[in-house]
Amino acid sequence: MKKIITLIFTFICALSLSAQELDTTIFILDEIVISSFYQSSTTTSSVVSPQDLNEINYGQEPSHVFSKMPSIISLNDNGTEYGYGYYRIRGLDQTRINVTLDGCPWNEAEDYGSYFANSPDLMSSMKTIRVERGAGSSYNGVAGVAGGIMLESINIFDQNNDSYAYLSAGSYFTNKVTGVYNMKPHNGWGLHIKATNQYTNGYKDYGFNSSQAFTIKTGYKFNERHTIDFLSMNGFHRNGQGWLGNTLEELELNPRANGNVESETDNWFMSMNRLQYKMWATDYLLISSSVYFQFQDGSYRFDLDNYMKRMYGDYTPYNMLYDYGLRHHMIGANFIEKCYLSDLTLTVGVNGYTYSRDHFLDNKSFNIPVEEYYSNRGTKTDVSSFAMLQYNPFRSVMVSGNIQYRYSAFDYIDFVNENNSFNRSDNGTEWNFCNFGFNADYTPINSTKIYAKFNHINREPTRSDMFGGNENFTGEFATLNPEIANDIEFGVEYTLGNKVYTNVNFYHMWFKNELILNGEYGLNGLPCHDNALESYRNGIEVDVKWRIVSSLNFDVNASYSSNKCTTETFGKTNHILTPAVTANADLYWNNKGFNVGFNTNYHSKMFIDMSNEYSIPYLWTLNFHSSYRYQKFEFSMRINNLTNRVNYSMGTLNDIGQILYFRNAGTNFVASVKYVF
């Protein structure tokens, strides 16, 4: 392992010394987006721009912004867009989606979750958000089997950043207060400070969310070639849980019923910090280096009687309330160089981190026998290196290839029962992966681009999968193999001036040992997975943006897919929670500070069990949005689900053949006012 890292750094240093200097214009560091280090120009992605972020951000969980993009759906716990939100790209859940913040890993490294609820009002501190669909082989951190989400924090050296106060209120006692201060760059210094408090009762009974956030980003710009900045994002949130559904009979009696009980709450604090230095070493060589630290502490409560009642019907009362404690920290660093050599662009980089998470159950729980107490620690080590070479033989042609080596290992310490402890070599929890990809673009005319790409990626099982959904190791591993994903994409982009943009993308993803949902949940509340013998996901995605006249716009996207898997028990069936059709449309008018429009969101029915006997119906909403700018004020109003349609974001099947539904809110609104200083 040490030899590999040494060779990588030797190669990077040699590259810096041997490259020929080019007579080029000095690039402005403010314009360098870190995500551009990790991708070629061939992408199947959607970008939320700074203007979009300003217009659509009202404190909602980012998952619900992603759901307006092709092939993406969002789910929620409490029936609203606040609190816990989840998202799936092409039917693949967020543990298969790589998330980075300024190139630094965001996912927690044991179960690969990426919970934006831990960082309330995240979007108020972002410059852009890029969502890439399809397997990616050059991400930092966990494997991006389904795609990647690249968060780019606000540019503190931008003269156009506004300081403002924001206040909103809406249905279910939803409210948000935010203050943002953006200092105009002064003597090389930049500063961004944000403080937010938001609350909602939630649509579900006692499905509340109470969140606070504080973010600071500051840095110094030495000149046009050198910048350094520090970012600290901190969030605290408390929730009434809602991860258990209800039967239709319960929802007919009380549409706002919650499958969880009132005593099942959680408390979390999360802090994400990073220090980043960027420089143009020469006119052709760009370097970025970062160190980062992530910390989270909290617990969630679990009522065993309620769980047994909902999932199994008949049960023996235990009168137990578990309080599962979790505390983790992650420390890491990355280093990237991008070198421009005439028709070639070479990018190389290294990322590594160590992650430790403590799991504990103690006397904060109620009526739990002392012998059930546990305390253990999982430690994850992850080191990866990658190289990407892009070649432009002609102005109209681009080809590129990338390769990544990734080493991952998991160790476990049981502080109560030492016999259950193990290291990475004891149980095969050490993996060496080689991921790679190829891309090609052809632009026959300025308005048209034809592209194709292929990626091959490997992913190891999560801790929860290996432990069978238990919070502590019981001595037996679930027999799961790493999954292998292959993804071929082909598409065409067409642009007609500033009037029309169209993208049509075809994809074929096939897997070996894909870890698919089996419809069951562990005692830790996380869904369980099994290896499929074989599986695939094929589809077409269409994205169109049309400026009908100067002030009237129409955006529409849709996808159609076939998603199959083969298992020993059920044979060939459809994937769970994977709709065959998704569609979104937005018709809006924007003129002289006034914006008004209607948008709609749809996805087809989804199966919730491996036998495909049970499903939840299609989802469709019609929404209204408007805003008006007057001098330093901006007023906005959003009304969701205008038709008051009954929608279910997801469902699960219990052991006695009942579907437990997660019902979304009916017609609801949020209104806001923003004052720019």
Positions of predicted regions on the chain:
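N-terminal periplasmic "start-of-domain" segments of outer-membrane beta-barrel proteins
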Residues: 26-59, 86
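A beta-strand signature from Gram-negative outer-membrane beta-barrel systems
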Residues: 120-164
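Transmembrane beta-barrel wall of Gram-negative outer-membrane proteins
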Residues: 169-199, 204-240, 265-285, 293, ...
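C-terminal beta-signal and adjacent terminal beta-strands/loops
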Residues: 458, 511-512, 554, 602-609, ...
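Surface-exposed extracellular loop regions of Gram-negative outer-membrane beta-barrel proteins
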Residues: 238-255, 358, 363, 407-422, ...
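Gram-negative outer-membrane beta-barrel transporters
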Residues: 503-511, 528-610, 672-676
